[in-house]
Amino acid sequence: MTKTAKVNEIVRDWVVLDAKDKVFGRLITEIAVLLRGKHRPFYTPNVDCGDFVVVINANKVKFSGMKLEDKEYFTHSGYFGSTKSKTLQEMLEKTPEKLYHLAVRGMLPKTKLGKAMIKKLKVYRDDKHPHTAQTSKKDAK
């Protein structure tokens, strides 16, 4: 009989990923798997059994091809003529946190469960982050 995970039985770990010199798409896939909990043997699709993920050095990630110049992100407020676009390079320089959240959100379920999963993603520009207490507990075991 297959074991299903229950909410009160889940123990969440804190995983720190260094984005320096990693390919963006492969890193985002790894983050999505950790947030969903698909790396665990008791993965249950209707329960949030994923870990907390802390990404450091977010703006030092690599992109393949000409994506930095060619890829664009669009925003629209709802008013006529208010469509604005930013290139991937601009997004990476100004708001790398938003870039990671947009990419990971596309790989998670579009439900309340997906919203709960994306809240466990913490992204920081450099290698300093305020979650050293949570991550050091895992290293002490």
Curated annotation (Swiss-Prot):
Q: Could you tell me the Gene Ontology terms of the biological process aspect for this record?
A: negative regulation of translation; translation
Q: Which UniProt keywords are given for this protein, alphabetically ordered?
A: Ribonucleoprotein, Ribosomal protein
Ranges that cross the membrane? none
**Which Gene Ontology molecular function entries are recorded, alphabetically?**
mRNA binding; structural constituent of ribosome
Organism domain of life:
Bacteria
InterPro entries from the entry?
A: Ribosomal_uL13, Ribosomal_uL13_bac-type, Ribosomal_uL13_CS, Ribosomal_uL13_sf
Keyword hit for Zinc: no
Pfam families (UniProt xref) = Ribosomal_L13 (PF00572)
User: Signal peptide: which range, if any?
Assistant: none
A cellular component annotation (GO) from this entry: cytosolic large ribosomal subunit
Q: How does it assemble?
A: Part of the 50S ribosomal subunit.
Q: What the protein does?
A: This protein is one of the early assembly proteins of the 50S ribosomal subunit, although it is not seen to bind rRNA by itself. It is important during the early stages of 50S assembly.
Name the family. Belongs to the universal ribosomal protein uL13 family.
Name listed for the protein in its UniProt record: Large ribosomal subunit protein uL13
Q: Which organism is it from?
A: Helicobacter pylori (strain Shi470)
